Regions:
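Short acidic low-complexity segments
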Residues: 31-42
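Short, Asp-centered acidic motifs that coordinate Mg2+ and/or phosphate
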Residues: 45
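Cysteine-nucleophile active-site neighborhood
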Residues: 52-121
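Pocket-forming structural segment of enzyme catalytic cores
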Residues: 90-164
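Beta-strand-turn-beta hairpins that frame and shape the catalytic cleft
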Residues: 137, 172-177
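Short, surface-exposed beta-strand/loop micro-motifs that present aromatic residues
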Residues: 165-172
């Protein structure tokens, strides 16, 4: 029997995480929901979920951002989903408060006539994205009014276009992956994707 892997979902205190837990559940995974970020970083994989607002989440992490950034730099595997991806950056126009700052850049509001960006949209992968847990996911479900702006394109694995705004929809730095969409709401393809990403991250530990 294979060793059980510990996955910790950090709960910002913003809402129901049931659909995410269901999407990533497996017999060889021990999934916990943690409200203490320092406890969450002891898991094999840390998951930053997509439920909540930047300001409240930054406040929930207050005092632990530096510890988390250090843990990520030391190789802690991490998956950030929607808001969780945005928290990997330094700051957001949405609210005051510091992000983790692991990926250089910031978060800005979409400058389009239709905000928020809701529903299914395409994902445009760069060729070098192969081997990053990508099982050819081409469309996914989005629900975002803010997007991540990297200092350069090196962390970006995929882009998505909403009206005339093209933004990073998948980023990776070391063992940390962020996705702007909600894989747990993206049907079977999304669930296959998020589980492939987690398996990829587990091998990095």
């Amino acid at each position: 029997m294979s060793e059980s892997r510990r996955l910790a979902i950090f709960d910002y205190g913003a809402g129901n995480l049931h659909s995410l837990v269901k999407a990533i559940s497996a017999d060889d995974r021990d999934i916990s929901i943690e409200t203490d970020l320092r406890v969450a970083t002891k898991a094999d994989v840390l998951v930053l979920p997509g439920v909540g607002a930047f300001g409240a989440a930054a406040n929930a992490m207050r005092g632990a951002q530096a510890d988390l950034s250090s843990a990520l730099a030391d190789g802690l595997p991490c998956l950030g989903i929607c808001l969780g991806m945005q928290l990997l950056f330094e700051a957001s126009e949405e609210a005051p408060g510091k992000g983790i700052g692991f990926i250089p850049g910031s978060v800005a509001r979409l400058r389009t006539s239709k905000v928020p960006h809701m529903g299914w949209n395409s994902i445009e992968w760069r060729e070098s994205a192969n081997g990053n847990g990508n099982p050819e996911l081409r469309t996914a479900y989005f629900a975002n009014a803010y997007v991540c702006q990297t200092e350069d394109d090196s962390p970006v694995l995929a882009w998505t276009t909403h009206q005339d705004a093209k933004f990073a929809s998948v980023v990776r730095s070391a063992n940390t992956i962020g996705v702007q969409f909600h894989p747990e709401k993206s049907s079977f393809g999304g669930r296959d994707f998020v589980n492939a990403v987690i398996e990829d991250l587990i091998t990095c530990r």
